[in-house]
Every structure is written in C-alpha cells, then in structure tokens.
Amino acid sequence: MTELTLKPGNATLADWRAIYRGAVPKLDEACRPKIKASAEAVARIVAKGEPVYGINTGFGKLASVRIPAGDLETLQRNIVLSHAAGVGEPMPVAIARLMMALKLASLAQGASGVRPETIDLLQAMLANDVIPVVPAQGSVGASGDLAPLSHMTAVMIGVGECFTPHGRFPAKVAFVSHGLEPVTLGAKEGLALLNGTQFSTAYALAALFEAEVLYQSALVAGALSTDAAKGSDAPFDPRIHLLRKHRGQIETAEALRNLMAGSAIRESHRVGDERVQDPYCLRCQPQVMGAALDVLRKAADTLGTEANGVTDNPLIFAEDDTALSGGNFHAEPVAFAADMIALAVCEIGSLSERRIAMLVDPALSGMPAFLTPKPGLNSGFMIPQVTAAALVSENKQKAYPASVDSIPTSANQEDHVSMAAHGARRLIGMVENATAVIGIELLAAAQGCDFHQPLASSDALEAVRKLVRAEVPHLDNDRHFHPDMEKAIAMVRSGATVRAAGAVALPSIAGAA
C-alpha cells in the first residue's frame, strides 16, 4: 500500500482521494508538539478541579452533573459504550478508512486534548488495515456523528468488531493478531473521538470522488450520443458560452468540442442538414452539465475546508489552558454540500436518460426504432431505456434536500440538527444509479454510431466505441441484455470510458487525479 504524509489542517482533496483509494496516511511529525501541548493542557484543567464540559461533567442534557476525579476514565469509557448505538449495515471499508483518517487529522491539530498514544493507536489501525465495523445508521449530524464515531472508538478500547485483510473479527482478536493494544481513554478523549463530522464528511467526499468519474463519463457518453444522433457541435462554440461566463459551462463546451473534433459523422451532415436545432438533451449539454460541474466544485470546496477543520467540542487552547464550548460539531456545511452533490448527480443521470430516449425514438434520431435492425421481431433498447427512467426517478426522490429536516434530540438540548449523515449516505447509491444510466447510454450511443459505418466518429470517441465493442458486440438480434449492461456499467464505474478517450482533457472537480 502507498504511504501518504498527512498534514493536519493542510490536506488536499487529492490527499483524501488517495486515502479513499487505499493510501495509508502517516501524520507529519511537525504536528507532534501541538498534540502534546493540548493533552498537557487538559491535564492541567483536570488538576484545577473547575467544571469543564466533557472533561469532568456529564454530556448533553446531563452537562450540569459534576463527575469526581476518580471517575473520569470511567466517564470516557461510558460515553463510548452508551453512544455506540447505531444500526444497519456496516459502512463500506473504504469510507470507514477515510473517516478514520479525517478524525486522525482533526485530533492531530492539537485542539482536542487527546494524548499522543491515543492518536498513535488510530494511526496504527490504519497502517495495519484494522477497520472498525461501523453501523451506517444512527447519526443526525449534530452533535457530530456520535453513534458511528462511537463504534469506531469502541474498537480502540477493545469492544466491537473489525474488518481486517483476513476477515471480520472481534476487536480484541484483531488487535492481538496485529500487535495492537487497546487504549484506556483519558480525560476528554472519548468525547473528542466520537464528537465531530468525520462520518458525514467521509461519505460526502467518497461520493464526490465517484461523482467526478461519473461527470467525466457522462461527457464522453453525451458526445458519443451527439454523433450517434447526427447532432450538431455548433452549440458548443466557445463564443456562446463566453457570453454567459459560467466557468463550468465554458469548460464543458470545450470538452465536448474536443471530444467530437475530427468526427467524419459530424462532417457528413454539416452542410445541407434540414434540422435547424437539436433537442435540449444534446444542445444544452454545456449549460446543464456545466451547472452540475460548478455545483460539484462548490461542494468540493466546502468539503475540503471541512476535512481540514476541527469539529469536536469543547476545544482546547493550550496557550492559556482554555476549554471553549461551541458548535463546530454541527454538520450544516456538510449537509448543504451533500445536497448539492445530490442535485448534480440527479441531473447528470436525468440528462443522460433523455439522450437514451431520444436515440431509441426514430422520429427524433432517424435511426431504427429502439436501435434494432428488425423492430417488432426484436425489442432492442426498449427496456434498457425503461430501466434508465426507473433509476432516474429513484434519484429524483432521493435528491430531496436532507438539510431542511431537523428533529430535536437529547431532551431538546440539541434542538436543531443537520441530517448531514443521511444526506451524505444516500449519495453513493445515487451515483451508482446514475452510473448505470450512463452505462446504458454508452451502449445505445455505440449502437447508433455503428449504424453510420463506414463513417467514423472522432479518434477519441472511436476509441470509446471500440472499448465497448471489445466487451459487448453490436446488437443485431435480441439477446440477454443484463450481462451487456453490467459490462458497460463497469466501464463507467472504473473510469475506463474516460481513459479510452485518451488525451482529451476533461474538467476536474476535486484536483489532480
């Protein structure tokens, strides 16, 4: 596994993407003095005996209850065990790993009062690929992602289960086999570990990285569909988009121009085409996809900031031994970012489905009905378009903003919450749905371009069509469609479609690949 030096507070989206893809984070040693100073500040606060929330008091509605000095370790263990109350399927290992790395970076900024040895255990778990089993349901996004982060922390004290390279095991068994030892949590450490937005942020970042591949694949499929339908590249003329000035629209139009450059199919109808304008699903790709790109970039900016922040409570300022209670655990920024990603993903899939519908309709595409040479005897792409419609409809239902909901918790002490966890968790499924739609479009567009042979598309799009044809032959007669669709979906999901387009530069959402 690749090792990545993690600089707390200064990590890039490319860093987080690399960790999501499997890189192992190793803390920059420059953060050590701040970690040590923060832990020492907590020790001095404890010694003073004054009431400080989360250090020597109860939690939430029970904040007014003072805890004796002899019970402080028990207090931290109790909050972890009592708050590990999530339900549902475990979060995916890659996202759980990212969550742990986000928590590691937050604690290492020296504002949480966590001792070096506790932080070192979290880092060692990542290095050994010992990943807590974390039920994915149970967070309302304030006060932080309490339940899921408690499940993560429970493993650190020897409770719960882990995923390891060798399978799923009780935490204590996994620790022994990897030479790890559970930690006894000190004052404030349990609260610092389980309070924060890292669960929601990890899910949102994972979806962002997958949405980047989705967006680029949709551009490739859209360009191929434009050629399949003998659509015009005139709507991608830069002069149109420079007048409107939206960056995403300008870059999307440029990418579409570059993808189609040199297409013999396009040149075959440049002169004498009786169609004056294409349907919106072709003509307005820069406007729709460009808007999606801009929204995804805004979400990326928000999540990049959040990933570099400290979001537990209270926060420790070692320079004057101050513990300040605030609300950095409130995940409203993450909830808004997740809602933005949901809207963009929904529209990317929606536009793709409209192109599929256009291609299978002979009145719009000029090609055989449902892209089959013998319509009637064969149904061709009839039901794949129905499947695409079903997936798009499901995404539209899921795209309703999560951030507008709130249910008070903790006896109304926590009376407004973000619902960021739900908003972020739904995104991976939405991206999967949209990925399937793009895969179906890829098959339909390749089929359409086949009908124009011997005319060929551009070099970039021909490479994509040949990639498809290497796995899925032209559809002459009806056959079992599902395996073909799965192969095309896998091409989109893996980024193979984008790579096949070669040197054509496609806009990026989250920094360098």
UniProtKB/Swiss-Prot annotation:
The modification 2,3-didehydroalanine (Ser) is found at S143. It catalyses: L-histidine = trans-urocanate + NH4(+). Pathway: Amino-acid degradation; L-histidine degradation into L-glutamate; N-formimidoyl-L-glutamate from L-histidine: step 1/3. Keywords: Cytoplasm, Histidine metabolism, Lyase. It is found in: Cytoplasm. PROSITE patterns: PAL_HISTIDASE (PS00488). There is a cross-link at A142-G144 (5-imidazolinone (Ala-Gly)). Its EC number is 4.3.1.3. GO terms for cellular component: cytoplasm. It comes from the Bacteria. Contains an active site 4-methylidene-imidazol-5-one (MIO), which is formed autocatalytically by cyclization and dehydration of residues Ala-Ser-Gly. Pfam families: Lyase_aromatic. Disulfide bonds: none annotated. It is an enzyme of class 4 (lyase). GO terms for molecular function: histidine ammonia-lyase activity. GO terms for biological process: L-histidine catabolic process to glutamate and formamide; L-histidine catabolic process to glutamate and formate. Its main location: cytoplasm. Belongs to the PAL/histidase family. PANTHER family: HISTIDINE AMMONIA-LYASE. HAMAP family: His_ammonia_lyase. This is Histidine ammonia-lyase. The lineage of its organism: Bacteria, Pseudomonadati, Pseudomonadota, Alphaproteobacteria, Hyphomicrobiales.
